[in-house]
């Protein structure tokens, strides 16, 4: 009979692994075993450590390290809210998502160096001292949109607006990724209260990740344009501001100014507001404005408050009614197919370049599987759709 193999895990390592993991996922039996290991009453088996590693969502190898490490991604220190506070620990869902995006960025960086060799001129091309107006002009020029781009072809619909701006941004070489779960694990949804988006700056392959659980679509659209401003400013960010976009630092103020100028230009807003008859009810006025701009009802009300077109009391009423208005105007669509969902997660140019590299032997299937989290026939079918 094979003997059960037990291993020594120092208490300092055990305590550290548990402190950075998803402890509330542990079963009562696992908690009792951990208490016994801490007291030295018995030692864990390899199988038990594997089980706890899975529940904590922490790499199995961490149990065998000589001393604790800090695996907090550097971008966590660049979060919008709380960056000046004690760091704490990000969730394992966020850590694993950033790790996957970093791996994709590393691959894309090397691919660009090998095939084109040039840096992207927009990365870090502006500073906050340049002001938001110049950054807005630069982004419009790069994305080939004019000041009133949202008036065309139903682009007041935030879903259509997001699709257009994402495609245009990808065309400039910026990687745009989005997901609502960790990889393909539907049991690990991303928390929008922890982060809405993040940007990883690199001169060859800047990457923007959008948290797809951040609702409604107008929130993701705002995050996308906000993060584009970070690319022009060459500044990493973990965007976790869930409050009204007033900004907390000059950097954030500039990025918010850029986003609002592109999505809701001041002059156009005022002209539209004044074109609506004075006796129009608030509900009807908001619905009319929503037909013109790809922003939330709250953003529209906030702009009206800024120009003293409504009172603070009316703004509060608008804010409270925003959820109802959003539900009434939401674009009801059927559920996307599996492959459409997978394609939407990845930057389109990244998938095209990856498919080409695999076909030429520059990237192994194993590495491609690791980058995408997709294997076998599913990967092959996805690549065919990506290049079709």
What are these regions (language model features)?
Residues 1-388:
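Active-site hotspot residues in diverse enzymes, especially metal/ion-binding acidic/histidine motifs
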């Amino acid at each position: 009979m094979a003997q059960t193999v037990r291993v020594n895990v120092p208490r300092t390592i055990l305590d550290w692994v548990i402190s950075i993991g998803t402890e509330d996922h542990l079963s009562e039996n696992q908690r009792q075993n951990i208490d016994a290991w801490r007291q030295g009453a018995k030692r864990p088996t390899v199988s038990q450590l594997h089980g706890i590693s899975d529940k904590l969502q922490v790499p199995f190898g961490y149990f065998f390290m000589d001393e604790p490490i800090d695996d907090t991604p550097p971008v966590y220190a660049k979060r919008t809210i709380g960056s000046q506070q004690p760091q704490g620990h990000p969730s394992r869902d966020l850590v694993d998502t950033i790790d996957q995006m970093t791996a994709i960025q590393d691959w894309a960086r090397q691919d660009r160096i090998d095939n084109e060799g040039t840096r992207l001129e927009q990365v870090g091309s502006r500073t906050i001292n340049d002001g938001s107006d110049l950054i807005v002009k630069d982004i419009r020029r790069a994305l080939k949109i004019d000041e009133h781009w949202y008036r065309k072809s139903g682009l007041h619909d935030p879903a259509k607006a997001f699709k257009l701006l994402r495609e245009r941004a990808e065309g400039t070489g910026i990687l745009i990724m989005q997901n609502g779960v960790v990889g393909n694990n539907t049991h690990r949804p991303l928390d929008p209260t922890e982060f809405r988006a993040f940007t990883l700056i690199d001169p060859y392959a800047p990457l923007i990740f959008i948290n797809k659980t951040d609702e409604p679509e107008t929130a993701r659209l705002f995050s996308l344009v906000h993060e584009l401003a970070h690319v022009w400013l060459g500044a990493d960010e973990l965007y976790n501001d869930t409050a009204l976009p007033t900004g907390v630092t000059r950097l954030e103020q500039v990025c918010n100014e850029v986003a609002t100028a592109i999505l809701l230009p001041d002059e156009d807003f005022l002209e539209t507001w004044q074109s609506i008859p004075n006796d129009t009810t608030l509900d009807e006025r908001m619905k009319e404005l929503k037909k013109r701009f790809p922003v939330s009802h709250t953003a529209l009300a906030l702009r009206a408050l800024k120009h003293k077109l409504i009172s603070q009391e009316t703004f509060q009423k608008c804010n409270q009614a925003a959820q109802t208005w959003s539900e009434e105007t939401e674009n009801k669509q059927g559920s996307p197919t599996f492959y459409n969902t997978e394609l939407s997660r990845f930057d389109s140019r990244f998938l095209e370049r990856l498919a080409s590299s695999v076909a030429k032997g520059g990237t192994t299937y194993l590495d491609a599987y690791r980058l995408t989290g997709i294997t076998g026939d599913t990967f092959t079918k996805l690549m065919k759709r990506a290049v079709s």
